[in-house]
Design a protein with these regions (language model features):
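Short, glycine/charged-enriched hinge/interface segments at domain edges or termini
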Residues: 1-57, 68-69
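A generic local secondary-structure boundary/capping motif
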Residues: 1-4, 30, 67-68, 106, ...
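Solvent-exposed alpha-helices and their adjacent loops that cap or buttress functional pockets
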Residues: 2-6, 44-45, 69-72, 109-110, ...
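Short glycine-rich anion-binding loops that position phosphate/pyrophosphate groups of nucleotides
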Residues: 17-18, 83-86, 131
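Short glycine/serine/threonine-rich phosphate/pyrophosphate-binding segments
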Residues: 21-22, 86-90, 136-137
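A general structural motif
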Residues: 30-36, 57-63, 106-115
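N-terminal small/polar loop signature for handling phosphorylated ligands or for N-terminal nucleophile
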Residues: 40-99
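Flexible glycine/proline-rich
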Residues: 95-170
Length: 170
């Protein structure tokens, strides 16, 4: 007998009033939802199955209902981008705390990618990543990719740790 693990299903939401579909014409103040496609590609690259979800607008009720609908799909993980900083319209962190178990809001000492929200929502691992595209991808690689590897029973996706000593400063 050979032990096997099924491929994790990862629901992906972007959030923000400024986001539009990638094929939409841009109006002033709008940006394309490029994070959805970048994250889908990374999720596929690491052997999981992406579940693209609608954009979550900057509205508490819409975010709650959107995440609840996503939970009904029974994903193995949920990833959101944007809405996790301290802005007046950044509601993902608040809703994640309301809906979640042991949800942590962190300021990680790295750039790009300082804000991070993680924990469980409805028993499902939840990762709230920054909305900045570079920060989103860096955070995915550092935090989400190792979690997906573990869900699959793999060790090759887990980032190695290296210790070093700084011998000179510029």
């Amino acid at each position: 007998q050979v032990p096997v693990n099924r491929r994790p299903r990862v629901a992906i939401h972007s959030s923000g009033n400024e986001l539009v579909a990638i094929d939409s014409a841009l109006k002033p103040g709008q940006i394309r939802n490029s994070n959805l496609y970048s994250l889908q590609a990374r999720v596929k690259r690491w052997g999981a199955i992406p579940i693209p979800r609608p954009i979550l607008r900057d509205d508490l009720t819409e975010i709650r209902s959107g995440l609840q609908e996503t939970l009904e799909l029974k994903p193995d993980a949920i990833v959101t981008t944007g809405g996790i900083s301290a802005g007046d319209l950044d509601h993902i962190r608040e809703v994640a705390r309301e809906m979640g178990d042991d949800v942590q809001i962190r300021k990680v000492a790295m750039k790009p990618g300082k804000p991070l929200v993680d924990g469980l929502i409805g028993g499902v691992p939840f990762f709230g990543l920054p909305g900045n595209p570079a920060a989103c991808l860096v955070s995915f690689e550092i935090f989400v990719r190792p979690a997906l590897a573990r869900m699959e029973g793999r060790t090759d996706g887990i980032l190695p740790q290296r210790c070093g000593v700084l011998k000179a400063e510029r």
